[in-house]
Amino acid sequence: MKKQVQHRQSIDLARFCAAFGVVFSHAFPTTEDWVGHLSVGLFLILTAFLAMQSMQRAGGRYGFVARAQKLVVPWLLWSAFFRVVDLVVSDTADRFILLENPWTLLIGSSIHLWFLPFIMGAMAFVQPVGRQINSPARLIRACAGLVALSVPFFWAHDRLGLPEPLPQWLIALPVYLLGLVMGIAQAMGRPLPTLAAAAGMSLVAYIVTGGAPWFFTPLAAVLVFEALWRLPMQARFLPALGQAAFGIYLLHPFMMLVVYKLFGSGVAPMFSAVAAFLMSWAGVVVARKIPLVARLM
């Protein structure tokens, strides 16, 4: 294992911006939704990259099981919370049928919760990837392997019509693995192989999906990461922004409903995006001061 890369506060800003991008995309729903795809891709890259940094700081050890267990309670409670919200705001006759779709057991009633069970499983790859890729030659082979892996995953996402959250996971896993490899590549001082892998993965996505709106996600997320990574930023408030990002992601669907309740469904999309984002941020700040609630963020 190479010497770890020191944490840079520009990454905290990147996490915060990615959270806003997700909120923004939900306020401006379109078939293209390039902001949402880029933001989720960046979230995946950053989550994996920071996990690899954590392993490097621990001398090559990563407590996957313990970390996954810490996410179980937040996952279950958030799923229950959004299920209750769905029962309150929905007027459909089938809203009380809990197992109409068994896959909802993984995500509750809100699809954005696909991220929590995905991360619980994906963390299992951190230590094996970190230990196996220990030379420039293995780095290059791993990057080539990511491009090859993306072919069946992206094809299955586009062609098989699988139930949610499987389509999200099929895109997310290759991108998450790319983020892990980026953590190693940066420590080696060799970012070009991962940039080439991202370009290859986007090309694969374009070919196998016929130019689906998300095909650019791997390359765009890596380019944004690389640009922000190089910004010489240092400020006391930046770590707090990064720490709030995931909580904002979790809270924003509820806050979006609050905005629509207060201002009506015809509210300007930009206003609803900014208002829901700021309300979610404020909610996270307050929640993190309450010990029992802080672990849910």
PLM regions: where:
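Membrane-cytosol interface segments of multi-pass membrane proteins
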Residues: 1-149, 265-297
